[in-house]
Each structure stands twice: as C-alpha cells, then as structure tokens.
Amino acid sequence: DFDLGSHSKKQNDLNIKSNITKNKDSNSKLAVQEDGEWVVPYVIEPSAGVERGFLAIINEAYSVEDLEDGKSRVVLKLKPHLSPIKAAVIPLKKNNKEIVSLSKLVKKRLQKLGLGRIIFENTGNIGKSYRKHDEIGTPLCITVDFESLDDKSVTVRDRDTMNQTRIEFEKLNDFLINTIKN
C-alpha cells in the first residue's frame, strides 16, 4: 500500500534517496525500509495515449534485412492500409519528358481511386528511390520506363519481397485496390 500523502510531504526532500537501500534477500529489486520492514515499491501507470499505440506499430514494423550482396536495408513493413504513402510513381529516366509526363498521368489516375497518398518521386536514381520508400513504408513503387511508352505497362515493385511485376495500365487500378485494401 502506498500513501500519497506521505509521498507529497517528501516530494521536495532531496535527501529521500538516503532512505532507500537494496534488500539483501531480493536479487535486484529495490526496497525501502520503513519501520524495520522491507517494502518493494511499485507504480501502476495507466496510459492509453495514441503515442504508445503508434510506437508499438512502428516498433513491430521496423526491420533491418541482410541482402545477398552483403549489404543491409531498412524496411518499415507497415500493413498497406496503415502506410501513409500508398504508392510512389517513379520515372526511370528523370530527364526524359515522355517518361516524366506518363509518370504524372499514372499518378493522377491512381489518385482518383481515393486510396490514400500517391506520390511522384523524381529525385535520385531508381535504386535510391526504392531504398528510400522501403524505409518510409511505401508498399508499392511503380516504375515508368521506356517499355511503358510502347507496351502501356509499368513495373510494380513490392516493398516486402522486392519482386517486380509488369502490369498493364488497364489492370493497375484493380491491382492497387487489391493490394492496399487486402
């Protein structure tokens, strides 16, 4: 039992530490001697804040994977419906106007689905873009390349497996809906 009144009386007493000793019978538990008896102090701190739940989700999703080439990658394996960014559309060649404009068109079409945030990634090379989106938990990276101009399809890379699949424009909406919602 703990009396909050006695705690309040000593809250500004900096010498209270001198009354705390370790019980010889306990392995590593701290004990306070009061009237010749040993009492193991305990605190119950109920908390139901959003921060703790968020931290638990982030902690569970964070992982570092060793790759075959000896390097490692950081991955935030959030469930797709929890991920703040649902997909990143990445043009393979940043200075090719046709690829960039097609990438923006793909992004615009996917945003109309209303699944969440779809971003256009136009910085760095493709490998660095993939790693960046692995770290921030983006489940899918959609790459628009030179083949996309001819065959009207894109390469979709899965964050967790790193597998890449070619998907036609007409099937991309359904693929994204199934991946994000399931």
Q: Predicted segment positions?
A:
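NTP/phosphate- and nucleic-acid-binding module
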Residues: 1-182
